[in-house]
């Protein structure tokens, strides 16, 4: 590799660096050698990541060699030169500018990125260099943990709590192996990213999370996300020592926002209410344990028997603190116009002091909250969500992050930070949306409009100064969009002696930039608030896009100011037919709001652009979205970028208003000649930096080229043009006539295509978060359903979605549940069948109807599976094949396998198990209604899974295909390609040789119906039907519909949705406690709803009825154990209960293996104990519940939010 000497340091570079790259590395070395901070801007595509790595690692190696040389010389001469500088040992040593006594270790390099996924790209660049340092990548448990039980936890904080619990008890064998195997392991390559850590940890049976933390001690360079550095809590949790380190923030244009957000919070009424409910649950649980201990004549009350080492008095005090905090927030008077009230930052200490949360008590409170969270870690159910408690812990740590000096009151700290913070209390506006959540504790809090406590930091200098105070040697901020550098440095309020604003490496024939103030029809283009939704402006913008799509080859990017503007534009273009015109030229792909589905959409876009038969594609995205931040649209993926407006922040948002006021106040304090940003300047910079990030997608390397269209008349203003990057401004031209702009850009692109070298073909994939195996990228990019999904505008524009007529809608779970319970056929008892058997049971296809539904795809993937491994949840092996001999996508089995892989990636493990069970049940029973009910629950409620519902068409039997297409169209608005003339032919082909090989010979004629099966029909399942697939009418079925209708009328749609979801889960897991917890929470709030709880007995399985009767007696306040309580419907096999709930041969749940106990159900601990209730000891002698005298009785009452 070429070597260049910069500032006395020899740098190995993969190729001869360009002048701007040499200048960039020189500035980096200047920061390192002088131990000063630097702000370095270099346009996207100039190789700044490579320059950063090579220059910093060269300096680190240079310093290591210099110190080694000094030590060798000392030993040879037998003299100590501790007081002499390294310069005495030659120019090589002098380049560092440090003395030997300054070092005990070589300074570590900390490379911080915005997301968890970006370090993978940086490590990929590192592997292309000559340097092989010791590397460590720090990630979260969500990316690194391989423990099955911890991975099942739904939230990140629950994963953390359960992990800590297992580590403390030494019950995680993966963690136990880290210390034993860390030194023994043979790491083939020293440069490991997240995926390598996970693979290596799984192979060696040791925890990747703690393995990476061990590797941190010996690492030369450490990669981590921003928040691990900027958030004091994260720094402490990951034991990050910053003393003497070199800290690099890549993509640093986001640092200001992340600094402020890491020191801010919003506390909602739901957060406090959920925390109170959890504490109340623990309080009653511990009181019950204490009572049982007294009844057993234990002379010491020991609550540790339940796993929680806390006194009842301490738990009660914690509950009182939260109650007082809630009262203090509610007591704040607000103006009547819902604007909220703003107070200085020091007010937060006054407010918390009313709840007895101070610098003196914070330690005990945090310790108590942590103990409760650890105690509940690993529990499942609706009443064990500890997110509220975890948020309260985080809030206390944020407020009291800086301890006051010894002997000084905490109020001095409040006065010191009041200038950087504001307290804003405002009415909660999202309480209606909160009612849709399935958490039973949140629905109570959401019945009233509470107050949100916001504590906002407006100065990123707080976090930056804290970094400097930690002893950071050098701080380097770099990005492609930092201009103007002076104001960017002023915001941080720390010195940055070294600054650089680099030019681009491209020539003038590689970039075309045009400001287009008017559309083809002469209408002014504007995204201003008063014009952005006008029909004239939207129509002109759509016509401009259509014309630009004609001349720009390959990939075209369109950036909107916000999601609402993009959705409104798409809606209008769809209605006016403009979207259809663009799609005819370049298919439209839309950036989803949900980040989880982004990778498959962008992969589908890449695939469409790379297709030789296509004219390219159009990708619609938003400024500040994922597509505009660090994603690669090099070469054909992005030949043109259209920016449709200036993305200003919402001007009336309270946080934006207060930020601008804060900056104006700071500028006023600094005097007339102060250089601080004004609020208006900051407001304009927020828009310009978002635009600069978006246009940076077009030029990604030295030989790339492209065109930039700025389609807003305000870009023609001098102040807006001055905010554009310095490398763009020389190419800028304003076009008063749209036709002239099209003429010039067409000429530019024709010349560029002829003169620029052809791009090297390469597989481009989106950057997904670490821990996601390569299988996801491969399957989703090759699976053509993702293309269909991505270009479906209806998915992304709510107003364009088709409405369901005559069938249960996706958002109407009670209707679908009625269909699930009332329209089922009797199923024959079948022997268990594996997943591959269900996969390969596909009718042979005649014609291209399914090809049309699935789309054409030619993936180069071959899957190697073992049935036993698949059934046990083992990993799939994927082998990439460059030239497969037999493309599997062309076969029915190949498409089926690819579809199943895509489904498994899209669903959780529990939902995927439900899907496979539904598939097997359909195969054995031909029960189409039950199948549709299951698929609707899994796929119809989430728009991003609509394509998977459509893709299931290939598994549907011929006589059900037309019905399935109708249902699919009404649920998703998508057709499956059904052709009536071919249904009879398909039916005949189901008895072909291919099916004979896949089905049991005894089931060929009837697809598994019991009346023709070769196997004996199960007892009680006699059928009088002579048609395949017809339903048998069952008495009592209307009771199910009547019950769900009554629930809907009494409790509302949201509560009915919760009940139906819980009932479906009960069918699957046989967990009575879980379903009763939901039903009881919904039906016991008001006395008139108690009959709904009693009537729920029609769904309870026979082996659960004694326990359910006892629970009902407890909840309804009856003194008996349920003997006098009659449930609606017969006690035994009720005709209203579906067969799936009464079959004794179902897989037993956790409660089927033992007889029902006479103890109270878990759910009862959530509700208030009535005075006449009693707790039974082992001798069954009733005794009133007694609490310790020191415990206030009013604290034992469950918390109920005010109506």
From Swiss-Prot:
Motif DEAH box: where in chain: 250-253
GO biological process, one term: DNA repair
Biased composition (Basic and acidic residues): 1123-1134, 1169-1181
Catalytic reactions on record: ATP + H2O = ADP + phosphate + H(+)
InterPro entries: ATP-dep_Helicase_C, DinG/Rad3-like, Helic_SF1/SF2_ATP-bd_DinG/Rad3, Helicase-like_DEXD_c2, HHD_RTEL1, P-loop_NTPase, RAD3-like_helicase_DEAD, Rad3/Chl1-like
UniProt keyword annotation of Protein biosynthesis present: no
Residues the entry annotates as binding ATP: 42-49
Chain span(s) of sequence motif Nuclear localization signal: 151-167, 871-877
Entry keyword annotation includes ATP-binding: yes
Keywords annotated in UniProt: 4Fe-4S, ATP-binding, DNA damage, DNA repair, DNA-binding, Helicase, Hydrolase, Iron, Iron-sulfur, Isomerase, Metal-binding, Nucleotide-binding, Nucleus
EC number: 5.6.2.-
Chain sites annotated for binding [4Fe-4S] cluster: 145, 163, 172, 207
An annotated Gene Ontology molecular function: ATP hydrolysis activity
Domain of life: Eukaryota
Written domain comment of the UniProt record: The PIP-box (PCNA interacting peptide) motif mediates the interaction with PCNA and localization to replication foci.
Similarity-based family: Belongs to the helicase family. RAD3/XPD subfamily.
Role this protein plays: A probable ATP-dependent DNA helicase implicated in telomere-length regulation, DNA repair and the maintenance of genomic stability. Acts as an anti-recombinase to counteract toxic recombination and limit crossover during meiosis. Regulates meiotic recombination and crossover homeostasis by physically dissociating strand invasion events and thereby promotes noncrossover repair by meiotic synthesis dependent strand annealing (SDSA) as well as disassembly of D loop recombination intermediates.
Name of the protein in question: Regulator of telomere elongation helicase 1
Gene: Rtel1
